[in-house]
Curated annotation (Swiss-Prot):
Name of the featured protein: Short-chain dehydrogenase/reductase malC
Catalytic activities: 1-hydroxy-3-{[2-(1,1-dimethylallyl)-indol-3-yl]methyl}-6H,7H,8H-5lambda(5)-pyrrolo[1,2-a]pyrazine + NADPH + H(+) = 1-hydroxy-3-{[2-(1,1-dimethylallyl)-indol-3-yl]methyl}-4H,6H,7H,8H-pyrrolo[1,2-a]pyrazine + NADP(+); 1-hydroxy-3-{[2-(1,1-dimethylallyl)-indol-3-yl]methyl}-4H,6H,7H,8H-pyrrolo[1,2-a]pyrazine = (+)-premalbrancheamide
Subcellular location: Membrane
Pathway(s) per entry: Alkaloid biosynthesis
Taxonomy, superkingdom: Eukaryota
Organism: Malbranchea aurantiaca
UniProt keyword Glycoprotein present: yes
Key words of the record: Glycoprotein, Membrane, NADP, Oxidoreductase, Transmembrane, Transmembrane helix
């Protein structure tokens, strides 16, 4: 009987692209990836944040000695050049070989506008990063990734898709759209595995910026709504993405990591 590979070895030497890997959940995924001996390419639109994230990953104390880290700037709001920007990103991440896993965590994390005042421009802007960009990645990735069950493409939605909060219709709509897109891609791109991670409340730097003085009130409400009584950290949720990369039997699935908030 052939020896069983350790779970930690399943990502060793693999090439992982994290789009939105400069902070929050995406950055936490990158940390886990390099702890497992994989090459991580993080992509973001802000060169300053990208540089700081790259330096932090290179200095990560638990980084496996064989892990390689690189970064790439990619403006997901540059609609006229979006497809070319993404193609350039995928080409850079693939290098002389192929990409094995792609994680898409990028999002326009701002307080959504009230329904009564939402504009076409705002609808399109949110849709560009949450729906259009992930779909274009799917269109382009066969040039840079082998479509096989060992590889994966993981998108991100949110608990809003199943349990909307007042005033979040714009984000709720696209979260649901991403989950539908994932199912379509899982069929169109088989046997490549395509899945979605759906986080609940996660305490990220961006969330702190959005909520400002209302942060503690919002966190207290989220704790009471959950069954665990706690708010997730990015590193908690990042484990869901690692699981999807490793489990070659999971595809077409929304993996909820929401502290039981959907139960109440």
């Amino acid at each position: 009987m052939a020896p069983t590979r350790r779970s930690r070895d399943l990502l060793r030497g693999k090439n992982v692209l994290i789009i939105g890997g400069t902070s929050g959940i995406g950055f936490a995924v990158a940390q886990l990836v390099i702890e497992h001996g994989a090459m991580a390419c993080i992509a973001g639109s802000n060169p300053t944040k990208l540089g700081k994230a790259l330096d932090a990953l290179k200095q990560h104390p638990d980084r496996d000695p064989i892990a390689i880290v690189q970064s790439a700037t990619c403006d997901l709001f540059d609609v006229p050049n979006l497809e070319q920007n993404l193609d350039n990103l995928l080409k850079l991440a693939a290098g002389d070989s192929k990409i094995h896993h792609i994680v898409f965590t990028a999002a326009d994390m701002v307080q959504p506008p009230p329904l009564a005042s939402v504009t076409i421009e705002q609808i399109q802007r949110v849709g560009t990063i949450r729906f259009t960009a992930p779909m274009l990645v799917a269109k382009l990735l066969p040039k840079y990734m082998e479509l096989c069950p060992e590889n994966s493409y993981t998108l991100t939605s949110g608990s809003h898709a199943k349990q909307p909060d007042p005033g979040w219709s714009l984000v709720t709509g696209y979260c649901g759209g991403v989950e539908g897109l994932m199912r379509g891609l899982a069929v169109d791109m088989m046997p490549l595995r395509v899945n979605v991670v759906s986080p609940g409340a996660v305490l990220t730097p961006v969330l702190r910026d959005i909520l400002g003085d209302s942060l503690e009130i919002a966190l207290d409400a989220a704790r009471k709504k959950s069954t665990t009584g706690r708010i997730a950290r990015p590193e908690d949720v990042a484990e869901a993405y690692l699981y999807i990369m490793k489990d070659q039997n999971i595809t077409g699935t929304v993996l909820e990591t929401s502290a039981g908030m959907l139960l109440r």
